[in-house]
Amino acid sequence: MAAVESRVCETEGCSSEAKLQCPTCIKLGIQGSYFCSQECFKGSWASHKLLHKKAKDDKIKPETSPWTMDGDINTDPWPGYRYTGKLRPHYPLTPMRPVPSYIQRPDYADHPLGMSESEQALKGTSQIKILSTEDIEGMRVVCRLAREVLGVAAMMVKSGITTEEIDHAVHLACISRNCYPSPLNYYNFPKSCCTSVNEVICHGIPDRRPLQDGDIVNVDITVYRDGYHGDLNETFYVGDVDEGAKRLVETTYECLMQAIDEVKPGVRYRELGNIIQKHAQANGFSVVRSYCGHGIHKLFHTAPNVPHYAKNKAVGVMKPGHVFTIEPMICEGGWQDETWPDGWTAITRDGKRSAQFEHTLLVTETGCEILTRRLEENGRPHFIS
């Protein structure tokens, strides 16, 4: 599950912090559109104004109804919301699933707002914890279990299966391993895993929409056991996908693995974004800026912050005992994102597809250990094997 990056200027090549928002976009209900200065805003105007035209055109198009699928009446949860792509939520959601009391729970599990007080206590710090031998063994165990749970989800992915059904299987797989599904009630996230289909970048909420032939879907798993979190995700093909989807998914996985190859003591965390963006751009794709990799151990999200785009300002140098995730989100079109009114589902602003892969890594004395590595198929992800 990705960490949220602070907003950066949307002007191509500018990575300054952005606090100014386009007033026309606000009026039209277009999310995002942040710039660092009037100069950058004016310099981007020629391309940026096309967003305004698209939003106006969408409002005058005759309405079609995406809310009926195979005789199943779906409730539109946000009437009037302008979707960027073809995907629609399929509501109502099922209630939040219970977790047996005998399973150890993270501090946010029963908080009314899902707030992690242990994370809040360290918010803003850039100090990166060096894990003890005991901590490292705990991380190895929980990451192995997280990998097993993702394997259960992988067997579920096929046309006609709903992401809600995948979530149910994930929930049961966590419970059977005496694990708490870390996303559940994390800042009130309502499900046990994230399922992100097509134009969804990350944090998609599982619902009753059946997967369709040609979809791509990312399943993001985090589990909590004995005080530690283990986090990973993969993007899967649903049935037969087009060549564009294959190129996107393959490139995204290559971005992750090329970054992992550079992980070793002495490397600056900011360097990973340079590696990822170089490979993505060489293949005609863009890199999401709003969501990042993160430190993980007894806390779900903590230092370091690990942006995936070039010329970022991430703080920190890798040392043995650091544990963190790399989880690049790569897009067919532009990197700009919006969020559905559910407050979680991040989607591409242009409605084009996005893919993601994630591993949890331990920095060793000479390189790194992939804690969430797949034990079968020589470690290859499911889309290859």
From Swiss-Prot:
Manganese as UniProt keyword: no
Q: Which BP terms in the Gene Ontology apply to this protein?
A: proteolysis
Which parts of the sequence bind Zn(2+) 3? 220, 231, 358
Cofactor names:
Zn(2+); Co(2+); Mn(2+); Fe(2+)
Its annotated compartments are:
Cytoplasm
Record-listed Zn(2+) 1 binding positions: 9, 14, 36, 40
Q: Name one GO molecular function term.
A: zinc ion binding
Keyword list (alphabetical) reads: Aminopeptidase, Cytoplasm, Hydrolase, Metal-binding, Protease, Zinc, Zinc-finger
> Quick one: where is this thing mainly located?
cytoplasm
> Where along this sequence does the record place binding of Zn(2+) 2?
22, 25, 48, 52
| GO CC terms in record | cytosolic ribosome
| Annotated Zn(2+) 4 binding sites | 231, 294, 327, 358
Is Electron transport given among the entry's keywords? no
C6H2-type zinc finger segments: 6-59
**What is the reaction catalyzed?**
Release of N-terminal amino acids, preferentially methionine, from peptides and arylamides
What are the binding positions for a protein in this chain? Answer: 203, 301
Q: Which family does it belong to?
A: Belongs to the peptidase M24A family. Methionine aminopeptidase type 1 subfamily.
Q: Per its record, how is this protein called by name?
A: Methionine aminopeptidase 1
Organismal lineage: Eukaryota, Metazoa, Chordata, Craniata, Vertebrata
